[in-house]
Swiss-Prot record:
It comes from the Bacteria. The gene is gatB. It comes from Streptococcus pyogenes serotype M5 (strain Manfredo). It catalyses: L-glutamyl-tRNA(Gln) + L-glutamine + ATP + H2O = L-glutaminyl-tRNA(Gln) + L-glutamate + ADP + phosphate + H(+); L-aspartyl-tRNA(Asn) + L-glutamine + ATP + H2O = L-asparaginyl-tRNA(Asn) + L-glutamate + ADP + phosphate + 2 H(+). Keywords: ATP-binding, Ligase, Nucleotide-binding, Protein biosynthesis. Belongs to the GatB/GatE family. GatB subfamily. This is Aspartyl/glutamyl-tRNA(Asn/Gln) amidotransferase subunit B.
Amino acid sequence: MNFETIIGLEVHVELNTNSKIFSPSSAHFGEDPNANTNVIDWSFPGVLPVMNKGVIDAGIKAALALNMDIHKEMHFDRKNYFYPDNPKAYQISQFDEPIGYNGWIEIKLEDGSTKKIRIERAHLEEDAGKNTHGTDGYSYVDLNRQGVPLIEIVSEADMRSPEEAYTYLTALKEIIQYTGISDVKMEEGSMRVDANISLRPYGQEQFGTKTELKNLNSFSNVRKGLEFEVERQAKLLRSGGVIRQETRRYDEANKGTILMRVKEGAADYRYFPEPDLPLYEIDDAWIDEMRAQLPQFPAQRRAKYEEELGLSAYDASQLTATKALSDFFETAVSLGGDAKQVSNWLQGEVAQFLNAEGKTIEEIRLTPDNLVEMIAIIADGTISSKMAKKVFVHLAKNGGSARAYVEKAGLVQISDPAVLVPIIHQVFADNEAAVADFKSGKRNADKAFTGFLMKATKGQANPQVAQQLLAQELQKLRD
């Protein structure tokens, strides 16, 4: 029997506000344990939450970017549960009226077709703290993360393969990153994914019993965990077994999933409206203000790069991987840079440098006008393509004008025959054995002179001009 795979994803995204959702504590990542906390985060008696408007702004932007309807009257709810990293014994979240609902994004499948993935809801909530279990037998609670604003984006169960889930996550991450509401760095916990997967016989309308997957710390592990579950569940069903509703975690070392707990039924969190926060009215003016702050998104930019700039689908996809890279590219082209040449540099030398340095394009000194100027002085023969790589590294580390650096460092390419011919004659005089080999007709003897000339000019001879002049002067030796 063959089975159809049914996948839905829950994605938690930390919003990059300066302060937390209900307290003035810093929301920045990476501080010492409990450094970013105050009495609200610790839930001291009598303290009250104060709404951070920037969180609602971010929620509106996310809802718009994901083609969602927006609840014009929005409230928060208490989700009741006890855990050491949750000192209030409840989480402030949204239950029946999330900020966004009925959304969708479009993904591109392997065969080139597109598919619309529906998004059920996006709701705002506060993050919980973090428990660490020490080797000394004690458990430690860090509340830096407590109260950091989150938006949870819940898809419908529209994905039919692990590959579709991977593609959906990639597209979702791009869109959220373009809005500017989060850096969506999984390695820092600002994007976290839980997956729900079930199988059903082809032709059956009713969903099978789902399994929830956790500990998915990369998109690659999401795909691997889902692939393992497809095989595990199919094998169990074919052998006459029954799928239990359970939570499993992905074990990267063993490349499989491990049972965490069995779910006997839906958890009863006893939701009720948060009495310490008011109803928030989101009017059209507020929505329009947030819409005006949104950029053009990756899909639209890719179409523009292909249709208007003549780039390949691959190039367009690479250039829109991050908003910063896409903005850099568009600025360079607007300054007169050739789209294909700018694209080649960004995907070639620039990408290699960023990978080697572990940096993003915003973190280096290269600017779009620097890059355009460097491409221009390659085109006019001031420097060679080989020398340009050295110039680029200087610009990436120090910034400044490409032409000014080339002139100051003495890197200007030598193209004047009046300068090169005497150097060629000196090369002949300094390499009599090579001249003798050439005159005797020894095979490939002429090729050695190119290296001698480049060495004599410290690599500054224009390769094309140098080859032409060498051929002329060698012909004179033969004559």
